Amino acid sequence: MGGTGKLVEELTNLLNRVGVRICLNEDIKSVEHKNSIAYKAITSNGKEYFFDNIIFNGDPPTFYSEILKPKKRNLINPILPDSLMTYSMGLFVLFFGTNNQYKDIAHHTIWLSKRFKGLLNDIFKEKDLPDDFSLYLHRPTATDQTFAPEGCDSYYVLCPVPNLRSSINWKVEGDNLKNNIINELERTIMPNLKSKIKDLSYMTPIDFKNDYRSMH
């Protein structure tokens, strides 16, 4: 079946069939505009591409503050200065496989904290990393066994966290949150999880900023 990766593959095939040129492994360093029209993209290796229209499928604040040259006023909300703009939550993503199968775990599982309003307040307003959390657990092998070797499972966990306007040290808290999530999943719905885990990794809001150019 393939999931999102298969969707990207088929979209690529479609673009190729209709004659769209796809350039990979080239990071856009800047986009230049003239008379309020963006017309040129410059890559990190100095290549220049000229266009009639440019569509940026990323975080708009990053585009206007870091990529568009010369810099213009805040085009997202011209009235508010950047310092007064509000941003959504950050995200912690935990990826892991297991050398067994948890057949009672569905393809999609929502794992909720006992708190609701207080948890959201900590994340969005106070920008504190709470001791508790709510999770989305994804098990694609529930419907597509090709996502893992025979007899194994593949997972990722999404955990809402404060964005980078917080003072959280993710070099420390990343491992702490990873361990807390695993402990809670093992305690509640995935017995003996720690002894079954293989190929564990995670992403913090810093990774989303560095790898995907999110603003916060």
Where are these regions (language model features)?
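Mid-domain catalytic core of redox enzymes
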Residues: 27-149
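A glycine-rich dinucleotide-binding beta-alpha-beta segment and adjacent secondary-structure elements
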Residues: 130-136, 191-216
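Helical element adjacent to the flavin cofactor pocket in flavoenzyme catalytic cores
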Residues: 1-39
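Short glycine/threonine-rich loop-to-helix capping motif typified by GTGT followed
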Residues: 35-37, 69, 168-171, 203-216
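Conserved FAD/dinucleotide-binding core of flavoprotein oxidoreductases
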Residues: 61-66, 149-180
